């Protein structure tokens, strides 16, 4: 496995190979990231993992400065699962001048849910991913479903810009107790880590209620289910930003929750740590 830090080195390394499969990451890797690399290997060609903590997707009050940076450990993990090339640019390499040209996704998808609580987040994500796509020129790019809204935004970007890239989605990797794996789980104290699986459990409760209503033909009151779920989290010491039942096709509120595929998404703070999760229904 080779590690490169400049765009020129990256392009030289890929010049004589088949089109690559790209796994974009911010580092601080866990088993969920490694599952993406393993999936990328199934698509032929070299597997490229990028490691870059992207300032553009962090608000000033967020955790850019303290986000874990563990490049040596990450490279060891990537080598162990068959990654061929790691692209780990510096900030000045990827952004040699102020990034005044940005990719602005549509508000109906990017300004709701995560976008409502993290203004500019998806603009930062789309801009850096577009730049990585231009650097790597992959045939396939692999993303996890844990960041469900991000996945949908990026699929839309690829479609509307006619990029010749297949976006592959991989199911959320979870700990044995159900907690979605995340680099930010490292921020949790021991008591918080014990409580953290309750976020997934709350989503399972919503999922079960929807499936039971569909089976019985009962009316689904999405707003009531969302409010009940948020109340459950608050009663356990969480500070929820949202629990939202949405159409999985476009993340809009369903006119008839019994008639179309759904996803329930949530974001909540436990102590100082903000966690997100989702379940398809």
Swiss-Prot record:
EC number: 6.3.2.1
Cellular compartments annotated: Cytoplasm
GO MF annotations, alphabetized: ATP binding; pantoate-beta-alanine ligase activity
Main location per the UniProt record: cytoplasm
Alphabetical list of Gene3D superfamilies matching this protein: HUPs, Pantoate-beta-alanine ligase, C-terminal domain
Amino acids binding ATP: 26-33, 144-147, 173, 181-184
Domain of life the protein comes from: Bacteria
Residues annotated for (R)-pantoate binding in this entry: 57, 150
Pathway(s): Cofactor biosynthesis; (R)-pantothenate biosynthesis; (R)-pantothenate from (R)-pantoate and beta-alanine: step 1/1
One Pfam family this sequence matches: Pantoate_ligase
Keyword Nucleotide-binding (UniProt): yes
A GO CC annotation given for this chain: cytosol
Keywords linked to the UniProt accession: ATP-binding, Cytoplasm, Ligase, Nucleotide-binding, Pantothenate biosynthesis
CDD domains: PanC
Subunit structure, interactors included: Homodimer.
Protein's recorded name: Pantothenate synthetase
Protein source organism: Methylibium petroleiphilum (strain ATCC BAA-1232 / LMG 22953 / PM1)
């Amino acid at each position: 496995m080779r590690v490169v830090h400049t765009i020129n080195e990256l392009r030289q390394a890929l010049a004589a190979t088949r089109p690559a499969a790209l796994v974009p990451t911010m580092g601080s890797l866990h088993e969920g990231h490694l599952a993406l690399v393993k999936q990328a290997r199934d698509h032929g060609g070299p597997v490229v993992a990028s490691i870059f903590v992207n300032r553009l997707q962090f608000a000033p009050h967020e955790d850019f400065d303290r986000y874990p940076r563990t490049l040596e450990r990450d490279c060891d993990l990537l080598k162990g699962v068959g990654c061929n090339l790691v692209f780990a640019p510096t900030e000045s390499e990827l952004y040699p001048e102020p990034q005044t040209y940005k990719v602005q996704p549509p508000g109906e998808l990017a300004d709701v849910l995560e976008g409502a609580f993290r203004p500019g987040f998806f603009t930062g994500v789309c801009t850096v991913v577009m730049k990585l796509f231009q650097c790597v020129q992959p045939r396939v790019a692999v993303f996890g479903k844990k960041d469900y809204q991000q996945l949908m935004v990026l699929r839309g970007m690829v479609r509307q810009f006619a990029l010749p890239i297949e976006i592959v989605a991989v199911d959320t990797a979870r700990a044995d107790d159900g907690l979605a794996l995340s680099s930010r789980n490292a921020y949790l104290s021991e008591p918080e880590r014990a409580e953290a699986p309750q976020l997934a459990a709350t989503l399972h409760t919503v999922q079960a209620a929807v499936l039971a209503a569909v089976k019985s033909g009962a009316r689904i009151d999405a707003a009531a289910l969302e409010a009940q779920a948020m109340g459950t989290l608050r009663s356990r010491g969480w500070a929820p930003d949202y629990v939202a039942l949405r159409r999985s096709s476009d993340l809009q509120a369903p006119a008839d929750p019994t008639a179309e595929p759904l996803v329930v998404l949530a974001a909540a703070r436990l102590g100082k740590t903000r966690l997100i999760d989702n379940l398809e229904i």
